[in-house]
Design a protein with these regions (language model features):
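S/T-rich, low-complexity, solvent-exposed segments of bacterial secretion/appendage proteins
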Residues: 1-418
Length: 418
């Protein structure tokens, strides 16, 4: 009989029952039309996971980059998409009442894989395994002090919210990407919410002696901003000192505070020695050209930056950036572009369809051969039967003539006796 899967009811299977004993038949043990249905189901499910992974990676990348720009309303950008969460499916053998919710970590969807996860409660904590076909690999096994608890799987772009009420041995299936392509939605429909401009404006003092220019390299976070302003504690200007160094000052008034100094004009913030060694303004910039002591360069919020499409170009550039994870490996270069990910999914499906078509053609040829072999032994040859009928007809006609001749002879004898 057909039974619902455990814990995923859509993952149906075939159960064999003999008396009081029951057992589940492995999906791979079926052939023919039934086996084709199961193979199609498994192939579609895997492809659905990959499309979900691609959808989440794209949406999160757009959200992250949009929040690094400025809108037409002189505001920092916000999310363009709403990333769906997924609820853990409890196994039927669970005895507790706990629940699990998986959420995509903002900015980390590029670390998502198309795989499902299994969470098992232990006596002291939880064990989390990643599922790859019939292979299960533990990726997290730690104690949990108390529940509810949140577990950060940064390497896989997820956070898991665990409620109280679980018993040791309880298990949950997590499918973070399975329905993502279907349930993902937009957070806004207003074109004005596209943050196409940079929130920073960089200018050179008109009294500078040199022709050196300043340009923005990148923005990685908006910790230096508050609403439509650049925080006073953030870098506001760079002054070339007498040694040719790049002194970085904040926006304190009336006296600016020296935050740090860089010795070269390339990636000034990354290479600067700040008074606070852990300080990171969340952006980087460079000054090109030969500078002169006393030159000043200003950093400010980009009010009314209507002719600035810096962040718009960054949004467009995401299509050629490596934003989708290739597999379960934690290697640094294990990423691909959105186009590559989509092409990979199409290629995978196309290869499987071609393989199944070949298998079907081979099975049809084998069936035809078997039918011909059977008919050659037990079947009827119409030509042979027609030949036999003609022969039987001729024999019948000959027999009829013999009978006729015998009857005539017998009649003649009777006439002679009379």
């Amino acid at each position: 009989s057909v039974v619902n899967g455990d814990p995923d009811p859509q993952n149906t299977g075939i159960q064999l029952k003999l008396g009081q004993a029951t057992t589940m038949l492995p999906n791979g043990s079926f052939g023919g039309e039934l086996g084709g249905y199961f193979t199609s189901r498994d192939t579609i499910s895997a492809t659905q996971n990959e499309l979900g992974q691609l959808s989440l990676a794209f949406a999160d990348a757009m959200n992250t980059q949009n929040k690094l720009g400025m809108t037409l309303n002189n505001e920092l950008g916000k999310d363009l998409f709403l990333l769906p969460s997924s609820s853990g499916m409890a196994y039927s053998s669970n005895t507790g009442t706990a629940s699990i919710t998986a959420n995509v970590s903002s900015g980390d969807a590029k670390n998502l894989t198309p795989n499902n996860f299994e969470v098992t409660y232990t006596a002291t904590g939880v064990d989390i395994s990643i599922l790859d076909g019939n292979t299960k690999t533990s990726v997290y096994n730690n104690a949990v002090a108390s529940y509810p608890a949140t577990i950060d799987l940064a390497n896989y772009g997820l956070t898991l919210d665990l409620s109280a009420g679980a018993n040791p041995g309880d298990k949950f299936l997590i499918q973070p990407t399975h329905n993502a392509a279907l349930t993902i939605s937009t957070a806004t429909s207003r074109p004005e919410d596209l943050a196409l401009a940079s929130p920073l404006q960089l200018t050179s003092d008109s009294n500078n002696y040199s022709n050196a220019t300043i340009k923005l390299d990148n923005i990685t976070d908006t910790s230096s901003f508050s609403g439509s302003t650049l925080l006073a504690s953030a870098p506001h200007k760079i002054v070339i000192n007498d040694s040719g160094g790049y002194d970085i000052y904040d926006g304190s008034s009336p006296t600016a505070v020296l935050l740090g100094t860089a010795t070269a004009g390339s990636n000034i913030m990354s290479n600067a020695s700040f008074t606070n060694p852990t300080y990171d303004p969340g952006f980087d910039l460079s000054i090109s050209g030969k500078v002169t002591p006393g030159d000043v360069f200003f950093i400010s919020f980009n009010n009314n930056g209507f002719s600035d499409n810096t962040n718009g170009l960054a949004l467009a550039g995401l299509q050629t950036s490596d934003m989708v994870r290739k597999g379960n490996s934690l290697a640094v270069d294990n990423k691909m572009t959105f186009n590559e990910a989509f092409s990979s999914t199409l290629t995978s499906v196309g290869t499987k369809v071609s393989s199944y078509k070949t298998s079907t053609a081979a099975a049809d040829a084998k069936l035809k051969q078997s039918q011909e072999l059977h008919e050659s032994v037990a079947g009827v040859n119409l030509d042979e039967e027609a030949s036999n009928l003609i022969r039987y007809q001729q024999a019948y006609a000959a027999s009829a003539k013999v009978i006729t001749a015998a009857r005539d002879t017998f009649d003649a004898l009777l006439s002679a006796v009379r």
